[in-house]
Design a protein with these regions (language model features):
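Flavin-dependent oxidoreductase catalytic cores
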Residues: 1-326
Length: 326
């Protein structure tokens, strides 16, 4: 399998896991890594939270050795605090520091962070320069096609980030106003790839091997990134890798495999967050895993009531009995 470099970091050219707040935590990342994700990015980390010593923020920075190559993603609107936070991230030894300039969530945008920075290119460039100046590793920037369909500026923005010292960029082919609706415009990613000399990661609507191959071919990007397409499907990374290598689809996972993965994932969440908090957070993951099963609406509602790991085991037994007719 081919590889490419972000700075001095070698990454296999299969598929990366996108940074997703409150989703791509350590347990989620480890599951995706086990199934072949070639590059992982953390949940977004508040630059000011890090600078002001917030313990919850600091916990987001903790890396397991098996997660590498790995990026910690910072967000913020103030170049000074972004630079200071990048310096603090050095103690966690990330392979890469990524800057979030693409998050569409109103709370983040309202503070001038995330995709709001696409409307403030000078501030965005200053942030990138400050992070590059303070980081001991390559710096990348993730952004969108633009703010809305009338202000598509990803190409100019990518050039600006390259000039500011970014070692790679990630472009999500949707605008901020689209959020996650409609289709991602892969042509924008292609244009970005043609405009800069640094590597370009493409993001948006990659959900399987066929769509991954199509994005590589249509955009010329150096790596594809999968976000929502991995919900309840960490094996999507294995599927992508196999398809890219052979041109063949792997068989659908069996119900037994799916339940075994869900069980392992929830056990990992509880390992890192404790059973009480872990099972609260596991509920949404379980709801994704049971999608498409017999009586999935009822099962998803049942997931919302999972309080203990024993509740989970009991639900899995019922699902297997129902699906397999035992």
């Amino acid at each position: 399998m081919n590889s490419f470099f972000i700075g001095n970091v070698e990454i296999e050219k299969t598929a990366a896991l996108a940074p997703m707040a409150s989703v791509a935590d350590k347990s989620y990342r480890l599951m995706c890594k086990e199934y072949g994700a070639s590059y992982l990015v953390s949940e977004m980390i508040s630059s000011k939270g890090l600078c002001f010593g917030d313990k919850k923020t600091a916990r987001l920075c903790e890396i397991e050795s098996e997660e590498r190559p790995y990026a910690l993603q910072l967000f913020g609107e103030d170049p000074y605090y972004m630079g200071k936070a990048a310096y603090k991230l050095n103690e966690y030894s990330p392979d890469i520091i990524d800057i979030n300039m693409g998050c569409p969530v109103p709370k983040i945008v309202g503070n001038g962070s995330g995709s709001a920075l696409m409307k403030l290119p000078d501030t965005a460039a200053e942030i990138c320069r400050e992070v590059v100046k303070n980081a001991n590793c390559p710096v990348t920037v993730k952004f969108r096609a633009g703010w809305d369909e009338n202000s598509i500026n990803a190409v100019e923005f990518a050039k600006l980030m390259e000039q500011a010292g970014a070692s790679a960029v990630t472009c999500h082919g949707r605008t901020r106003t689209q959020f996650y609706s409609g289709k991602a415009d892969w042509d924008i990613i292609k244009q970005v790839k043609g405009a800069v000399k640094i590597p370009v990661i493409g993001n948006g609507d990659v959900v399987d091997g066929e769509s991954a191959k199509a994005m590589y071919e249509q955009t010329g990007c150096d790596l594809v990134m999968i976000g929502r397409g991995s919900y309840g499907r960490p094996w999507v990374f294995r599927d992508v890798k196999h398809y890219l290598e052979t041109g063949e689809k792997l068989p659908e996972v069996t119900i037994e495999e799916k339940m075994a993965v869900m069980k392992k994932h929830c056990e990992l969440i509880c390992k890192y967050k404790g059973e009480r908090q872990g099972m609260k957070e596991a509920r949404k993951n379980c709801a994704w895993y049971v999608k498409g099963l017999k009586g999935s609406a009822r099962l998803r509602a049942q997931c919302g009531g999972l309080n203990t790991i024993s509740d989970l085991y009991e639900m899995i037994d019922h699902i297997l009995a129902n699906e397999l007719g035992e």
